[in-house]
């Protein structure tokens, strides 16, 4: 494999490993060692170690006492914790945006992209869907909040890979609910935006938890539209 070329070799190598995790090329069954990474990408072992540690810090890899790293295996309880944390963080963001009738252009663009993917593979929707939500959080203008949210997004993508991109929500329902959130922001109605978000995330949360082997919790939100 060709040597990775970038201004920051550690960042470039971490980005390559991260993409392999998100594509499903690296799974929990694959042992990842500093020596293997150094040999594969023709980098020094300290560089390989730094790249692996970067993904450990992001919650994508975990390391054993013998320094072997593996993709983190998430379970139903992890999924519920991730999504409930997301819901709390995003709800506060929506209230702040609604106070000033802020409708982020990047969120509008991401939702328009999702609308074109009605026949695409489930995983093809994940990237623009995450971009929609990330754009909302970034619009709040808090670097720390954005940094925390990106960690959650990485874990959500990892969950999706584990269930091999099963359809958790229909594309049409995702687009419709995103649009309802944007309309509520434009109207300055933060509580309406939060109500839509809560139903949106709770359905995805329980379907993802069920796909990982859990019995779904009672759903408070209505089913997806046909």
Segments from the language model and where they lie:
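Short linear motifs at protein or domain termini
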Residues: 1-102, 209-226
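Short, solvent-exposed amphipathic helices
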Residues: 84-89, 128, 151, 200-203, ...
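Alpha-helix N-cap/helix-start motif at coil-to-helix transitions, marked by capping-box chemistry
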Residues: 7-11, 83-87, 101, 108, ...
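A ubiquitous short alpha-helical element
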Residues: 76-79, 94, 98-99, 116-120, ...
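Mobile beta-alpha loop/short-helix "lid" or hinge segments that flank ligand
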Residues: 57, 61-62, 150-155, 170-172
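Conserved amphipathic alpha-helical segments that form helical-bundle/coiled-coil interaction surfaces
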Residues: 104-162, 175-184, 192-202
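A short secondary-structure junction motif
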Residues: 20, 24, 152, 156-159, ...
């Amino acid at each position: 494999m060709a040597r990775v070329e970038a201004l920051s070799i550690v960042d470039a190598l971490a980005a390559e490993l991260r993409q392999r995790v998100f594509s499903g090329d690296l799974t929990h069954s694959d042992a990842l060692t500093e020596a293997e990474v150094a040999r594969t990408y023709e980098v020094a072992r300290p560089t390989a170690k730094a790249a692996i540690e970067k993904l450990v810090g992001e919650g994508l890899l975990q390391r054993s006492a013998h320094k072997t790293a593996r993709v983190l295996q998430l379970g139903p309880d992890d999924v519920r914790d991730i999504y409930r944390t997301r819901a709390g963080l995003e709800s506060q963001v929506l209230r702040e945006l609604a106070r000033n009738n802020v409708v982020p252009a990047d969120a509008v663009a991401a939702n328009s992209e999702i609308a074109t993917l009605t026949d695409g593979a489930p995983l093809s929707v994940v990237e623009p869907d995450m971009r929609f939500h990330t754009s909302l959080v970034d619009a709040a203008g808090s670097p720390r909040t954005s940094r925390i949210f990106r960690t959650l997004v990485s874990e959500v993508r990892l969950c999706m890979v584990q269930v091999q991109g099963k359809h958790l929500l229909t594309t049409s329902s995702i687009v419709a609910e995103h649009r309802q959130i944007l309309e509520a922001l434009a109207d300055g109605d933060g509580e309406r935006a939060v109500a839509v978000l809560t139903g949106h995330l709770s359905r995805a949360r329980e379907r993802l938890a069920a796909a990982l082997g859990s019995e779904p919790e009672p759903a408070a939100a209505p089913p997806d539209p046909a």
